Amino acid sequence: NDLVGGCQYSDITVFSFHPVKIITTGEGGAAMTNSLLYAEKMKLLRSHGIIRDKSKMTGNPDGPWYYEQIDLGFNYRMTDIQAALGNSQLNRLDWYVSRRKEFSEWYDEKFHNTGITPLTQKKDRKSAHHLYVLKVIDSNQDNKKLYNYLYQKGIGVNLHYIPIYKQPFFQKKMVNLNIKELSTENADKYYSQALTLPLHPRMTLEMLEYIVNKIYIFFD
C-alpha cells in the first residue's frame, strides 16, 4: 500500500515523463526524496548550482541582482507549461493505469498456447504497465522475425532493450578497464526473445484484435 515514490527502499526515486510514459510533460522527469539534504542538493544542481539566498552566500550582496554559483550544475529546470501539462493528467492517472492493466490482461489471455508468452508478474507486486513485453519461445521463430513482420503490417512494435554491453560507449569502457569477459547469458537470452507490443489507454478493441490476429497468422 506504499505510494510509488515514497522512497521506502531508496534514497531517491526518479520518474520519467518521456512522451511514451504514463504521464508525460513532453520530456523530463521528477525526483522524489524524503531527505532534506538530497532535496536541497537537487534544487541547487537543477539551476547551474546558483543560489540567491543571502544566508547561504559567502560574499556580501551589493544589490538584489546578486547571486553566487557554489556548485557545477546545469539547466534541469522544467517549464511552467510542462508542469501544467503533467499536472493536468494526474486526475486521470488511475484511469490510465487501469486501462493499461485491462489491455495487458486481455493480451495475456489471447497468447495462451501460442509461440509467445507474456512476462510473468509476481502476485505481491503491482505494475503500472508502462510496456507490454512478451517473449518469443517458439524455437522455429525469433523476436526479430516477428518484429519485422508486424512492422510491415503497420504495427508499432519495438525491442526493449539492447544489452548495454553491446553499446560502443560501454565497449570502450570495458577496454579501458581491461574487462575481457562478461557473463551476459541472461541479458542475451532476454534480448533474443523480448518484443514490445503497442499499449495505450486509448487503444480500441479493433486495434488490439488486429495486432493479435496478425500474431496468430505469423505463428500459424
PLM ranges: what are they?
Residues 1-24, 40, 65-70:
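Conserved active-site segment immediately N-terminal to the catalytic lysine
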Residues 26-28, 50:
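Acyl-thioester C-C bond-transforming condensing/cleaving domain
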